[in-house]
Amino acid sequence: SNVGMLGFSLMALEKFYCYDKKNKLNEKEIKAFIKSKNKKKIVFGFTSKVWAFFNDSNFLKKQINFNGITLVHGGGWKKMKDSEVSKKYFDETLKKKYNFLNILNYYGLVEQTGSIFFQCKLHRHFHTTIFSDIIIRDKNFISVNKKKGIVQLISLLPFSYPGHNILTQDVGEIIG
């Protein structure tokens, strides 16, 4: 969503867009991004779009090194189900092929923009923030820890629309 991109871009000193208005690779922008003097660089995108971008035949012909750059991606895993790309394969392939410093995955919903749950490197679990929480429900009640159920997201951030409390279709569990 444009709102998600806007939110992440607020932290940027410079912004570069890898696609032009006709949805074609913008090689000039990509090269400018790589050559930028900023020390900390982040590539942001939605998971399925990131995968499509880095596997685009036109892009694969380029030998672009993202050494020292962090990739932040989230959402789009349901769209990736048909391609049978696992999270582990996604990370390993992009690190090996493009030399990313870090690859950070997050969980979030466009319906609750601003609430994102980053996956830790150590255990690959998603974590809440001080502004949000997750409740796991079975079909009737709040589920106990370590039992799978439907994910309900709670957030302090949305106040201009009723997005502070959303029951999703996703299945999850609280580990600790």
Regions found by a protein language model. Give the residues of each.
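Active-site glycine/GP-rich loop and adjacent strand/helix microenvironment
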Residues: 2-176
